[in-house]
Regions:
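Divalent metal-coordination and catalytic microenvironments
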Residues: 51, 90-92, 283
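Long, charge-rich alpha-helical interaction segments
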Residues: 131-195
Length: 324
């Protein structure tokens, strides 16, 4: 595959890094991680990790792309590091919207200065931030997402997710990120296209306790559809694996629903019920968590329902919301 990046070098890892020490031991100085360390975001010396999943208060933490945007425009990160290492190694695990947008910001840092006032680019960066902070359950106007080219820009990721991980995963991830970057360049140059939202998520279970279990059918736009329908607390089946295991997300749409939809308690209970309880399968932040995207969960959605119902019922009772 020809190299389509010059400022950065995308490095797709075979595993996520366990913590900061693991990352620093494993990669060269002047390296950047994008949602690839099971640890807090930030920087340590000449190592940076843009993330908003582990060890954070979700609603008080920017998306990885917004962190990268500020680091490039205000912090002059790329300008400062390029004299020491070029290309700059950027470690990734997947090619979701936040990672793709972060990679574009790092690779095309010079374009940010030229087009920083571009309303559509600014809108996409800001709207990605809102959606990601809320785990995809931000109340949206679906037509606005289509009209402002958000769905078109990230269509390559949607296609990759719909088809699942293929052989040659690293090439698939790099190609997906490159395609999204190409579309962002087209956006800046007035050549953006249009992609309608066609996701039809299935509600598998609607709890009297105010949460739903939904099957995304492999389409990342499903969560936007669910948010537009007014769902706020969600256990989401992302995919069924060929191994028979599952990938889930657990999302609380409002930080103020902690007393009635306790994500941390739910995740701890799901972890305890796994077939490999000593392997860390479930984790995340206070508002959005899920099962490990590498190993997957052994629990089907009916088992999650049976575990979640008494926890949510008790939480609502203690909060005085059991009758609502």
């Amino acid at each position: 595959m020809p190299n389509r990046f010059h400022t950065i070098k995308l490095c797709v890892t075979s595993r996520r890094f366990q913590d900061w020490d693991d990352f620093i031991r494993s990669v060269p100085e002047y390296s950047i991680g994008l949602e690839v360390i099971d640890d807090t975001p930030g920087h340590r010396g000449h190592y940076v990790h843009f993330d908003h999943h582990a060890g954070v208060i979700r609603e008080a933490t920017m998306s990885a792309a917004m962190q990268a945007y500020l680091a490039v425009r205000q912090g002059r990160l790329i300008e400062r590091w390029l004299p020491h290492r070029k290309p700059i190694p950027v470690y990734v695990w997947n090619a979701d919207q936040d990672v793709c947008l972060s990679a574009f910001i790092l690779e095309y840092h010079d374009l940010l200065e030229q087009f920083h006032a571009n309303a559509l680019l600014r809108w996409i960066v800001q709207f990605n931030n809102k959606i990601d902070v809320c785990g995809g359950l931000y109340p949206v106007d679906l037509a606005e997402l289509e009209r402002n080219h958000f769905t078109w820009v990230f269509e390559p990721f949607r296609q990759q997710r719909m088809h699942g991980r293929a052989d040659g995963h690293a090439d698939v991830v790099i190609d997906t990120i490159a395609q999204v970057c190409d579309r962002l360049k087209d956006l800046l140059e007035g050549r953006a296209g249009y992609a309608p939202i066609t996701a039809v998520p299935e509600i598998l279970y609607e709890s009297p306790g105010g949460f739903v279990i939904a099957d995304e059918k492999g389409d990342p736009n499903s969560r936007l559809v669910l948010a537009a329908r007014g769902y706020t607390n969600l256990i989401s089946l992302i995919c069924r694996r060929v191994t028979g295991r599952y990938t889930y997300s657990v999302i609380r749409g409002s930080p103020y629903d902690e007393d009635i939809f306790p994500v941390t308690k739910l995740v701890d209970a799901f972890q305890a019920a796994e077939d490999l309880p000593d392997a860390r399968i479930w984790g995340g932040s206070n508002m959005a968590a899920g099962s490990d995207s590498e190993m997957g969960s052994s629990l089907d959605w009916q088992r999650l329902r049976d575990i979640a119902e008494p926890i949510v019922k008790e939480a609502r009772r203690l909060s005085g919301n059991d009758g609502q």
